[in-house]
Amino acid sequence: PKHKRFENLGADDKNGVFICLECLKKYDSIKVVFFREEETGCRGSSEAVMSFFDDVRFVIQPDRKGNSDLITSIGYADLCSEGFMEAIEPEKWGYMEENGLMTDILTLKEKGLEVSCLNVSCGYYNAHTDEEITVKKDLMKSLLFVEHIIEDCTNTYPHTQSDSYFSPYEFEDEIYDIRL
C-alpha cells in the first residue's frame, strides 16, 4: 500500500491485562477491574462504584513502563502504607519506590479507597510510539512479583490518603516570583 499505517503495540495496557488474566487463572478468589480512558483523564476509574473495593486487601495496578519502578506516591500523595511496603519486600524482587503521574489508583484514592495501592512496572517500553515493545523477561518478573504479593501479603493493608495530589498551579506564585 502507498500509505502504510502502523499502530503501536498497546503494551502499556495489554501487559497489565495479561497479568490480570494470568492471576484470574491461578487464584480462586481475586478481584480484577479494567477501566477505560486512563490516558485521557482516568474517566473510567472516576466513575467506579467504590463498594466493589469494600473487601479488598490492597490494589495493584500493573501499568508502569520499565522493569523496576514501584509507584508508591504521585506528587505529594502517598498511595500505600509503610507496613505494606515492608510486607511486599520490593528490593528483594528488584523494584524501587518511585513517584508517578496521574493514574487510575490515584483517582480511586481520591474517591475514598482506603487500602494500600501500587502501580508496578510491567515490562513495556516506548509507550504510545511506533517503537513500543514488551520485554518478556520483564513482563514475567512483574507477574511473579504480583503473585508474590497476592500469596504472601495476606493481611489487609489500610491506607487513607491524607495529602492532596500535586497541582502544577500549587507553586505558581513562586514560579512567577522567580521570573520577575
What name fits each language-model region?
Residues 80-90, 138-146:
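Gly/Ser/Thr-rich active-site loops/lids in small-molecule metabolic enzymes
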Residues 126-180:
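His/Asp/Glu-rich mid-to-C-terminal helical/loop segments that flank catalytic regions of hydrolases
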Residues 3-83, 97-100, 104-105:
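Acidic/histidine-rich catalytic neighborhood of metal-dependent amide-processing enzymes
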Residues 19-22, 107, 141, 145-148:
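Alpha-helical scaffold segments in soluble metabolic enzymes
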Residues 96-142:
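Zn-dependent metallopeptidase/amidohydrolase metal-coordination segment
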Residues 26-30, 113-116, 153-156:
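Short helix-capping/linker segments at secondary-structure and domain boundaries
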Residues 23, 88-92, 146, 150-153:
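Hydrophobic, Leu/Ile/Phe/Ala-enriched alpha-helical segments that form helix-helix packing faces
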